[in-house]
Amino acid sequence: MKLYSIETGNFKLDGGAMFGVVPKPLWEKTNPADSKNRIEMSARCLLIEDGDKLILVDAGLGDKQSETFFSHYSRSGDASLLNSLNSLGFNPNDITDVLFTHLHFDHCGGATKREGEKIVPVFKNARFYCSKSHWEWATVSPNPRERASFLQENLLPLMESGQLTLYDSDKDGVCPELGLDLLLVNGHTEKMALPKVKYQGKTILFASDLVPTAGHIPVPYLMGYDVRPLVTMDEKSRILKSAVEQNTLLFMQHDPYNEIVVLKDTEKGVRLDRGMSLKEAFES
């Protein structure tokens, strides 16, 4: 097995929205804001090469939305999903599977593209995997709070392509088609899936939006986007405590400075020990 960190380009979101009720003087110590109060965010994905499988976890924002849409998020950097794959010697047709942690636009937008008048999958040979409960949450009757993040042009073409697999998601377990252990959490959104990967004697948890940046490690530091913030607090407390006890590394999706973080227990609770690149985490 090999793991690769896939950069898809940075974007910005309002710092207040990203930290909810946490006062700015506290959160800007780790996530400095620009003149519009926005903080820098990565849209990092994880690529898992395992035998004849090439599994992509999430797909970034993509590029098919309008200039007006992207103007709200101040995208930056030269990285893109396809360029990052190409730099590793892969092309879109090599991807065998795509696992979505959830279906907010910054996690799944890069899985489809415009092709003439149609929107089609970028990865022609891949199966796309999503929790059945989360898919229904996002497509059948999306709630007013999340509707703007569930862009149907990102979602329905996947179903129409015949490449979508909806897995049963009532509890934590294994996605049998991929052989990945999944933690299912419900604070940020319904049935967000956090894959756990054992690699070179260590365990990595893809933190997704449970812990979007290292600045969000303290349990009360929650995003204003979470639909069930008290549930998020319970989930973070339990999962981060377990991560410390089991020496689990967190793969950071939205932290522009750290790909991997190591946690430690302190008198104030679980905190950041150190951050590093994926490569550094596995250097002997």
What are these regions (language model features)?
Residues 72-83, 200-284:
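Cap/insert and terminal regions of metallo-dependent hydrolase folds
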